[in-house]
């Protein structure tokens, strides 16, 4: 992307680089439902072409509905979070990495047994 600025002194070009590339899809390494609709989820850290890993965020979805987000706190064991499910019973969990430009990755990968958790009432 290039931006052209016109002034009395003549045109001046300002070159900028837009980030259109999404981060890599995270991989769910742990997802478990607990009582009172609590969800603990952990993912391996994603990578991005421009945003450092420490600045990526992760949106958490249950049955396609966003229920929260996680920040990368620099842990070597991945990114972990406690979220709250919206209903009891089976919930399909997916996670998407988001870079500083707002690009979202493809949905998380991982074994299907990891992605479906049960929400338990209080």
Task: State the predicted function of each range.
Residues 56-60:
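Short beta-strand elements bearing conserved aromatic residues within extracellular beta-rich modules
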């Amino acid at each position: 992307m290039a931006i052209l600025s016109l002034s009395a002194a003549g045109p001046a070009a300002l070159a900028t680089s837009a980030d259109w590339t999404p981060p890599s899809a995270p991989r769910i390494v742990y997802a478990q439902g607990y009582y009172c609709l609590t969800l603990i989820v952990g993912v391996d850290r994603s990578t991005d072409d421009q945003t450092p890993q420490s600045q990526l965020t992760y949106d958490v979805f249950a049955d396609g509905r966003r229920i929260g987000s996680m920040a990368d706190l620099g842990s070597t064991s991945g990114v972990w979070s406690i979220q709250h499910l919206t209903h009891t019973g089976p919930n399909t969990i997916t996670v998407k990495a988001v870079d500083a430009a707002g690009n979202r990755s493809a949905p998380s990968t991982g074994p299907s047994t990891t992605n479906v958790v049960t929400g338990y009432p209080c």
